[in-house]
Amino acid sequence: MNIGIRQHGRWIPIAIAALGFVLVVSGVAAADRSTAPGTFVGSDLITEDVEAAAKFYRGLFDWDMAKAGDGYSIHHKGRLIASISGIEDGDPEVSRSFWLVGIVVNNLKGSISAAQKNGAEVVEKPRKVSGGYGTFAVIRDAENAPVMLIQPGKTPVGGTTGPGAWVWAELWTDDIVKASQFYTDVVGVGHEGYDRGGKPYHVFTSQGTYRAGIIEIPEELETVKPGWA
């Protein structure tokens, strides 16, 4: 549900984060977008410069921000939707800024078990968040892409709409078929395949709604590693 600064190889919570990466044109109600499997409702911007990042996103989206430890919590329309935290000095696993996204699952324990069976590594064991926001864990998927798995609690998070709301997420992968099956098994979503200019493009679906896209990394982009964007 939330993560924060990384210390001694672990993500330490500093603020409840909830980024609703959902397709707003779906017409699904906000509460559904916050709880349906495959919905993106938690994210932490891990950055080299916390203050610069906060200034940039505050100006870009007019988000409301509040200090949370050494970082910030981010609110949109009164709901907590994200957090910003700094990269720990000397952390070999994090060398540059990135958004760590979170995906809703119905059964966190079951999803972790499925992830491990499919080649994932558990980075942060399940951690309950106070305030009724639920429980989260952090894994690296079969291609080493970091992602949060979130089992929501009673307190609603994310699910906002309009300017400043999040509307989509996309997984860049070296193997679109393998990645699609991994998240189908782990998250409990379906996936549909399309042809986009002669290139395969898959979409995660749940409850009749498109949740995110999957694209295979072009051969010419040799330095791009699998990950969520």
Language model regions located:
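A cross-kingdom feature marking solvent-exposed beta-strand/loop segments within repeated
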Residues: D32, A68-S73, L80-V104, K109-T135, ...
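N-terminal secretory signal peptides that target proteins for export/translocation
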Residues: M1-G9
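N-terminal beta-strand motif that seeds the catalytic metal site of vicinal oxygen chelate
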Residues: G27-A54, F98-I103, M148-S180, G190-E192, ...
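Core segments of cupin and vicinal oxygen chelate
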Residues: T35-P37, V41-I81, K117, V123-G134, ...
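A sequence-level detector of short linear motifs
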Residues: A82-S83, M148, A212-G213
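Bacterial N-terminal signal peptides
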Residues: P13-V24
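Composition-driven detection of intrinsically disordered, low-complexity segments
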Residues: W11-I12, Y133
